[in-house]
């Protein structure tokens, strides 16, 4: 009995002493919260290289693809990679019975062969900021839930108008941590997006939820696009 008791105490002591640095952090908070700790654990990027408003950083390479996916910009010419299933609808829309890019695949050999995709956009994060104090300054404990909601929504609209530069940017305001903090995000959308390459459907289609939890699994779940824009974006 004694040895089991000692073993149980040892396990509990070990569990209690384990510190889990896990979770998700807003990019602008990495420097303040845990930037030095991440570097001690082997991260080679500085907080400034992860998120910077004035200089190129990781935030400029990881983008939103058509609202529901992410993509990675891999060249200064706007080439980007995303999942095959993220580009699926655009590839399907470009396909015809004669040129079934979805079934047979497609790779442009030069810029002229790239195919303009309709109703597709890529969204870059320009900057984000904390507006918790501003919004909380408009609230008071005596407000009803409806009054609180109305004040917050009005402030959201004001923040969006102040930062959109007459529609140049898309501005999104979100609450975090169960409504205790508020941040706004300024995005720039690029709508001239062209298909550069996609594998055949038999290679690219990853199988959805049916195959998503099966291993080993080998799929080429990728597609390649390029963003075009003028000097003003």
Regions found by a protein language model. Give the residues of each.
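Terminal presequence/propeptide segments associated with secretion/organelle targeting
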Residues: 16-233
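Bacterial Sec-dependent N-terminal signal peptides
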Residues: 1-22
């Amino acid at each position: 009995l004694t040895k089991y008791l000692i073993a149980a105490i040892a396990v509990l002591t070990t569990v209690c002493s384990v510190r889990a640095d896990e979770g998700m952090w807003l990019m602008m908070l990495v420097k303040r919260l845990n930037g030095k700790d991440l570097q001690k654990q082997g991260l080679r990027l500085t907080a400034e290289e992860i998120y910077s408003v004035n200089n190129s950083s990781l935030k400029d390479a990881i983008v939103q693809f058509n609202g529901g996916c992410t993509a990675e910009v891999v060249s200064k010419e706007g080439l980007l990679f995303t999942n095959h299933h993220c580009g699926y609808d655009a590839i399907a829309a470009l396909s015809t019975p004669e040129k079934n890019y979805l079934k047979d695949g497609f790779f442009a050999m030069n810029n002229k062969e790239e195919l303009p995709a309709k109703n597709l956009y890529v969204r870059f994060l320009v900057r984000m900021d904390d507006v918790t104090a501003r919004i909380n300054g408009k609230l008071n404990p005596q407000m009803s839930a409806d009054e609180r909601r109305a004040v917050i929504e009005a402030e959201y609209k004001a923040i969006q108008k102040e930062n959109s530069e007459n529609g140049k940017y898309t501005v999104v305001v979100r609450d975090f941590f169960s409504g205790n903090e508020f941040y706004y995000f300024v995005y720039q959308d690029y709508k001239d997006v062209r298909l550069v390459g996609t594998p055949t459907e038999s290679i690219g289609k990853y199988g959805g939820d049916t195959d998503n939890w099966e291993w080993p699994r080998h799929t080429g779940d990728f597609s390649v696009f390029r963003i075009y824009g003028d000097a003003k974006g």
